[in-house]
Amino acid sequence: MTNTLLLIAQLNVMLKKLKTLISVSALVLVCAFASTLESCKSCNSGKDLGIEETSDTTLRAINAKITAEPNNFAHYLERARYYSGLKKYAEANADIVRAKAIDSTKADIYFTAGKIHFDQQRVVEAYEDYKKCLEKDPQHKEGLLEKAAMDIALNNYELALQQINTVLRQDERVAYAYYLKGRLYRQVKDTTLALSSYQTAIEVDPSYYDAYVEAGLVCASYGNPLAKEYYNSAIEIHPNFIEPYYNKAIFLQETGVKNPSNYQEALVCYDKILGIDANFSAAYFNKGFVYLVYLKDYQKGIESFNLALEKNPNYYQAAYNRALCYEGKGDKTNAEADLNLALKLKPDYTEAALELGRLRGDD
């Protein structure tokens, strides 16, 4: 009996110690849970989510999405793209880091990072981002095309074509894919396939401005009059863009020998450009060049070169060509003055030095 009572007493002591231990452990768990909750609150705080007070309504709308779904990586990518458009690259890159922290396996994260790095002209990093995008998803259409565009620039033509065709096997109605094919073939000087690719891009997307412009350049490279029509289509899409007027004017003045009316039409294009930007000195210069070289109207050439130099006082080519206009009029004094001006602006201007020597030798 005594031994039994002693055993019961020892068990009671052990039970009390066990209860105390359980209580302490429970307290530790409660404290740890509370600490974790506080930590989570801190992790999801506005500051850690990249949310600042702003009057920008678009940014506020994106921030609201992030607040509602802080673990949705797509919201951070949306904000990164928005920041990149504002050239706030530090903020954009921070959102890429947040997106990767949520799920680093998503191809869209690396595609967006590539676009942002490319916008910053960090092309090596952009190329690596696109490679990672395709590692995560080899069928990622946008990633394939952006990497293909860079591969064309790097002369990786076979790889670029493979990537473009991978996209077209998924969807044959991607205008940008045909446009890139056009660029590739144009770069390797296959004008037939280049033009065909641009035409297909236009068929898929009749408002594809860049495809019209580059199709025009391909046609212009071998004097095809279709160049003018492609440039006209580009002008219809963007009537306030200088580029298509300028390209059209160059084509017209270079083909004026076969069709002399092209010279006047080229002058009209330059006037259109000056209506868009009155300070575009190259348009004044090119007008002067048409008057000097093609129309032999030296006075109008002088007037145009005057305006080119007024807009750009360092335009040494304008001074040189104005000198030639004065020579055409028989005014050697002003011609010599302009040749000296051209050499003052560009001391190693060989053509001006030779012309000045010839002019003085005639005296």
Positions of PLM-derived features:
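Bacterial Sec-dependent N-terminal signal peptides
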Residues: M1-E52
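N-terminal leader/linker segments that initiate helical-solenoid repeat arrays
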Residues: L37-V97, A101, G361-D363
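Terminal, low-structured helical/coil segments at or just beyond the last alpha-helical repeat
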Residues: S42-G46, E254, Y320, L324-D363
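Structural signature of tandem alpha-helical TPR/SEL1-like repeats
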Residues: E52-A61, K87-R98, Q120-K132, L154-T166, ...
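Helix-start (N-cap) detector for alpha-helical repeat units in TPR-like alpha-solenoids
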Residues: F73-A74, A107-D108, K141-E142, A175-Y176, ...
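Position-specific recognition of the canonical hydrophobic site in helix A of tetratricopeptide repeat
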Residues: S84, F111, F118, L145, ...
